[in-house]
Amino acid sequence: MNLLVKPMVCCPQRFVVHLCTHSTKTYHVTSKHQNKIMEKLVGAAGGNQAAGGAGGASSYEALKKLDQQWLQMRSMTTTTQGMMMIATRKNKRRQEEEQVFDAVVCGGTLGVFLATALALKGMKVAIVERGPLRGRVQEWNVSRKELRELVKIGVLTDAELEDVIAVEFNPSRVGFDGGTEVWVKDILNLGVSPEKLIATCKKRFLGAGGVVLEGMGVSKVNVFDDAAVVLLDDGTTLVSRLILDVMGNSSPIVRQIRWGQRPDGVCLVVGTCARGFENNSTSDLIYTRTPVTQVGSSKTQYFWEAFPAGSGPRDRTTYMFTYLDATPNRPSLEQMLEDYWDLMPPYQGIKLEDVEILRVLFGLFPTYRSSPLPAAFDRILQVGDASGIQSPISFGGFAAITRHLSRLSSGLMDALESDLLDKENLALLNPYLPNLSGVWMYQRAMSVQLDINPSPDFINNLLSINFQCMEKLGDPVIRPFLQDVIQFVPQAKLLISIMVNKPLFIPQILQQVGFLPLLDWTRHFIALAAYSVLWLAIAPSLLSWVESLPKEKQYVWRRQLEAWQYGSGFDYNG
């Protein structure tokens, strides 16, 4: 048996302990306290370890280590600063005999998709991956539309798309304790096998002339006028015109850029993939069973998510998660796991001793208001979770990056072909998106604020009212929201519906959210309206004019048009 520490199902920066059984022996959870459970699992795993995708191999210490990182994040005490970027201006860094890549992608688990798209368009691309470039056992949950983005950019064929789907299920539930329960179809209803998906993309990438460097981490990046030089931890040096940082929230480059910033919000997640669920044909997108819960010296609202797993008809993944700020007395992952063992059985209608734990999952997901992260250096661009492109109320990762693959692949090709690789031009690929920034009010509304004392049922009531109104307004309102797409007209309809149907609840919302955050949200909501008008009324008349411009101007205007489209949510088409 091997104990693997891997990133979580939807996010390559969340550490997950996977107990991979290679024998017929079954291990059941019988202890109430998670530390005893984890120690039992680790003891059974022994010292035999194996790398299992991004994140590599480790031990039970990963839980303690991640909790220590969470403590440092809350207290803002750490001794580890990001690696120093050396921005030395030399006219001739490149030698004629040097091998120069068009792009080096750091972080292959999610970076392989963009790397393959660029390689298929004739770019010379290398992938640097700290561990083996292979997918993990745990599925990624996505909608079919999101997965089809890989076909759209040429990374997968239609047949390959069907082959990487491990499980498909319907319908999915949204429900809140004592309130609304809504059922929807075809949202996050696919479980995709990362093993098959990464293997397929890796093969296509290599076939297109790509280079993969596995078992190597990034040690330092030096930026020059004519190239960026990546120094790997084994001493290997790569010279490239562009560096794509797809190393997620744990990226040392992001750590340097955000040094000294406390996260504006954090999602803590614990869960398991287990065997023994008889009723296993539907999923939960978001569900609550309890009011606000006291956890140590803090309070929090627990949410649930559950999906059938592709490893067997009785296998099911359940997550318990919460939204918090990064103040010192917030609960640890260990404390949450203690609650998970008590709360999961009644949530799923099972007895803990009747299920076999296959994998234990845990992680934290920091988010920042200043997102997406604009390019801070010439020739370096953050992509995916590293850029903060994910919604503050989502898990990020695979589903978050697929939505932007078409935009990013075409934009990066324009930048490379026109040699527009300075930070000002690269920043246009991570533009301000008002629909993303506006989601912060939802994240705050779903968090328990320590400086106010609302009713323990407030968050459940708020969400129940929201989804009750969305259900009445129909699919054009509820479906985009459940896929992290915020659009002006659906949101305006929702707000009007709440004010008309539940006017007495408005003062409670204002108390929970606060005046300044509400004022900030209003600014983004107005921008969302403006972006919607610009995309619908102005953009169509500009398309032919943009094509007549010089390439450098085309690049700028194409990025502006994309910002209007994606920033207004009109990249979503159902």
Tell me what each language-model feature is:
Residues 5, 9-102, 121, 561-574:
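Extreme N-terminal leader/targeting segments of oxidoreductases
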Residues 111-112:
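N-terminal Rossmann-fold NAD(P) dinucleotide-binding loop
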Residues 140-141, 182-204, 252, 269, ...:
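Short beta-strand to alpha-helix junction loop
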Residues 310-312, 325-444:
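FAD/FMN-dependent oxidoreductases across multiple families
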